[in-house]
Curated annotation (Swiss-Prot):
Residues 77-206 form the SEC7 domain. Residues 265-381 form the PH domain. One of its GO terms (molecular function) is phosphatidylinositol-3,4,5-trisphosphate binding. Signal peptide: none annotated. This is Cytohesin-3. Residues 392-400 are annotated as: C-terminal autoinhibitory region. Residues 14-61 form a coiled coil. It holds the Pfam family Sec7. It is a peripheral membrane protein. A 1,2-diacyl-sn-glycero-3-phospho-(1D-myo-inositol-3,4,5-trisphosphate) binds at K273, L274, G275, G276, G277, R278, V279, K280, T281, R285, Y296, R306, N355. It is found in: Cytoplasm, Cytosol; Cell membrane. Binds via its PH domain to the inositol head group of phosphatidylinositol 3,4,5-trisphosphate. Autoinhibited by its C-terminal basic region.
Amino acid sequence: MDEGGGGEGGSVPEDLSLEEREELLDIRRRKKELIDDIERLKYEIAEVMTEIDNLTSVEESKTTQRNKQIAMGRKKFNMDPKKGIQFLIENDLLQSSPEDVAQFLYKGEGLNKTVIGDYLGERDDFNIKVLQAFVELHEFADLNLVQALRQFLWSFRLPGEAQKIDRMMEAFASRYCLCNPGVFQSTDTCYVLSFAIIMLNTSLHNHNVRDKPTAERFITMNRGINEGGDLPEELLRNLYESIKNEPFKIPEDDGNDLTHTFFNPDREGWLLKLGGGRVKTWKRRWFILTDNCLYYFEYTTDKEPRGIIPLENLSIREVEDPRKPNCFELYNPSHKGQVIKACKTEADGRVVEGNHVVYRISAPSPEEKEEWMKSIKASISRDPFYDMLATRKRRIANKK
């Protein structure tokens, strides 16, 4: 006989009183209820955790999706900057104001610096506003011109196109003069000197350029650019030393940049030059063509040239001379009969203006004459950029 042996929670010992049995059964019932409650709570907690996980994964997927879209926008920008900017704006990843676009380019994360330079140099009204906002993100106060150029030229890569370079360097010069009032008489002075520094950087640190300019030559080449007056020699010397000791760091994206624009039809060799004095004599000189200038030295080992002939505004032509073969001339097609702007060093070390209306030069052979004429023509006409520089210099000269 099973006296009360069944019931909840298994058998009940027979030696318990009725009251004890009921108490035991009640304990077992409550235990079961607690176990059920715990299981229910576990289930509810699991459900809540699943919901939290789902919410987190939704947020994560939104962030992941946003990051993917930003990365896609950067890739599009590097392939086609206008399409890249448009994609980022359409997907609410970038505001459409010039200031926001400029900030995006200034941070430059994942962006090709050559493409940044091309975009900033464009002529569209919006791009010009972006360039202005981009330049305003640079703080040039209390920096000398080399320090400011270092900062500016690291934030993008200067394009090779003359008009783009002009707009960008004009914006730089205006910003520098605004941050440093009183350093230069005008933005034109800052503009011309900035290019002199960029060319100096290439001359000093490009291994293809054998003739390394000295501080004295750098100072000579920049006479009269401060509204017709000279800049302090100490300022120019400090800028020279800064570049000599540490070249510009140029973003390494590709080869189409300003430093490549300036150099390459370089040529050097012995030529005969007809003197410009009253007694016309032929003198053998070592000529170096570089940096849109023709330098001539008495000896190949000389550190300083005997003369410097800037090629801007000049033309070249083949001529016959009864005394020497293989001749050509440099002349100014716009001002016939006018002395060509050039300088030479006298025996006592004084730098004086040249007195040539034309420079007549004789090469050792017909082949070398052809090569020299070809290189000089290439140097004169290879980039409209030099016309822009010449325009700036004329503007400065006219303010005298």
